[in-house]
Design a protein with these regions (language model features):
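Hydrophobic alpha-helical segments
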Residues: 1-177
C-alpha cells in the first residue's frame, strides 16, 4: 500500500517528489515479501488447495514488480496504471487471505476471520484513498473529475467494509479498531 501511494505521488509530481521515500519503501516491501514467501513455504503442507492456488496467482502477478518499478522510476507508466497494478496485486493477496474462511470448521473462527478480512479490506480502501490523494498532492493540481469519482468510490467502499467490520465484531474487537 505504501509503495503504491509513494509511486503514485512520484509519477504525478513528474519525479519531483517522493523519490527517496519510494526507494526506501521498495526495500521495505521486498523485505516483507521475503518474510511472507518464507512463511508460505513453511506452512505449505498445511494450506488448503484453494489458498495455495490464490497465493500462486498473487505470486505470479508480482513477478513483474521489477519491470513495473523500472517503468515507474523511468516515468514511462502513468499514475493511473501504477495505481491499478498495485491495487490488483493487493486484491490478489486479500483474495488468498479470504480463501481461508471456508476452510474453517468452527463458526466463531469463521466469524473472527471474516472480521479480520473486513478490517484488512477497510485498511486497503484507506490505502487507496491515501494513494489517490498522494497523486493529487504530488501533481500540485486541483482534483480532477476522474480522481474525484475514484475517491468517492473508494470512500463508499471503505465505509461498507467498516460497517461490515462493526456488525460482525465483538465489542472488544470493535474497540480495538
Amino acid at each position: 500500500q505504501k509503495e503504491r501511494g509513494l509511486s503514485s505521488g512520484f509519477l504525478a509530481s513528474k519525479g519531483e517528489k517522493f523519490r527517496d521515500e519510494m526507494m526506501v519503501q521498495r526495500k521495505v516491501t521486498d523485505e516483507h515479501a521475503k518474510v511472507l514467501s518464507e512463511a508460505i513455504k513453511q506452512q505449505d503442507s498445511y494450506l488448503p488447495a484453494t489458498v495455495k492456488k490464490s497465493l500462486a496467482e498473487a505470486t505470479a502477478f508480482m513477478a513483474e514488480v521489477d519491470a513495473r518499478r523500472s517503468g515507474i522510476s523511468n516515468q514511462v507508466l502513468s499514475p493511473a496504471d501504477t495505481f491499478a497494478w498495485f491495487t490488483r496485486a493487493i486484491e490478489l493477496n486479500l483474495a488468498a487471505t479470504s480463501q481461508v474462511t471456508p476452510t474453517l470448521s468452527q463458526a466463531d473462527m469463521m466469524r473472527r476471520f471474516n472480521v479480520y478480512v473486513s478490517f484488512l479490506s477497510t485498511k486497503e480502501q484507506a490505502g487507496q484513498e491515501r494513494a489517490t490523494l498522494n497523486a493529487v498532492l504530488g501533481a500540485d493540481l486541483p482534483l480532477d473529475s476522474t480522481l474525484l469519482r475514484r475517491l468517492s468510490s473508494i470512500l463508499a467502499s471503505q465505509d461498507t467494509y467498516l460497517t461490515n467490520f462493526r456488525v460482525m465484531a465483538t465489542p472488544s474487537e470493535g474497540e480495538a479498531l
